[in-house]
Amino acid sequence: MKKFVAFALVLAMAFALCACTPNEDKDDFKVGVILVGDENEGYTYAHMEGIEAARVACGLEKDQIIYKYNIEENEACYQAAVDLVEQGCKIVFANSFGHESFLIQAAKEYPDVLFCHATGQTAAKQTDLKNIFNYFTAIYEARYVSGVVAGMKLKELMDNGTVTDPHVGYVGAYPYAEVVSGYTAFFLGIQSIVPDAYMEVQYTNKWFDLTLEAEAANALMARGCVIIGQHADSTGAPSAIQAAHDDGTYPNVYSVGYNIDMLNVAPDVALTSPQNNWGAYYTYAIKTAMEGKEMQQDWCYGYIDEAVQISQLGTACAEGTQEAVAAVIDKIKNGELHVFDCSTFTVNGEHLTSYDKSYGFEGTELIWDGYFHESEVISAPLFDIRIDGITELG
């Protein structure tokens, strides 16, 4: 039921972008989708929801969408892309960071096909190809809001004497900018409520691994963490936290998930999850391709365009959380609040006033007007700064 509700929200948002204009070639239009996982993995499931919302909004039949599941970040991606083109796909999407170079390879060989890559950093800006595109959401905004949810709970636990140490944990997949940006936004959201909070990050070095994510959560609980967020794609961490709650080992530890509502697996401890509304992009891209119009080469939108959100609040959330969340989202939308406001964090005890990013963008200043302009130079996150108050464990 929760998955249906989530899909309904994405679908409604997709229709709001406007249904695709019919044309004589619509019945022949095919869409290829290369996925790093399948419906059992939260990140990929969110992309599947977005594609399905776009399919309905654009009036396509199910057999006009061709999926390639569990495609690793290697030559298999190139082979999948070629096969999709040979099956008649006019636009091909790939949803994992490591797919990019293989998608570029295919784009060079098939200039009349559009290739769109999620989370990429180079395709749209560092090639002369006109048929390669990057896309992401401003998920850091939703991660900040989820941090506010966590901070409200942490404050409640401290105010009532349940805990005395504002120790937070985070299960991260890899030490990439995407993950660093996300956990920093989450942490800053927490600190906006509990300024003394500090956080430890445990890496799994896998995007999706139930066992490793559960082990990371258990290790963080053993270290005294009372709120645990994640940028990893399974239900492993919330499930482990729920199990520790049920057996009394750690009855007062709470979870903030990612991608999907975690209340099904962690009903007593799940607070919320930051979520991408991928349907916003997929509807835009498919509609634009079908109409033969020029497509934005590097796309990123957030709360103001309904491309991100947090899931429903769990029953364990602190009183007043809904009101706090609404206020923060309003501030993000009207530009009053910037997630990476440099006055809210330090690096080695100093506030940053300048930061030049590499990744082929040497000399590009990312800090002006007092904050780091995430996902503005390119759609993919570039914030890889290790700020004070956060420790990476490995």
Task: Outline where the language-model segments fall.
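C-terminal motif of bacterial Sec signal peptides marking the signal peptidase cleavage site
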Residues: A16-A19
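Positively charged n-region of N-terminal signal peptides that target proteins for export
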Residues: M1-L9
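A residue-level marker of the well-folded mature domains of exported/periplasmic proteins
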Residues: N23-G394
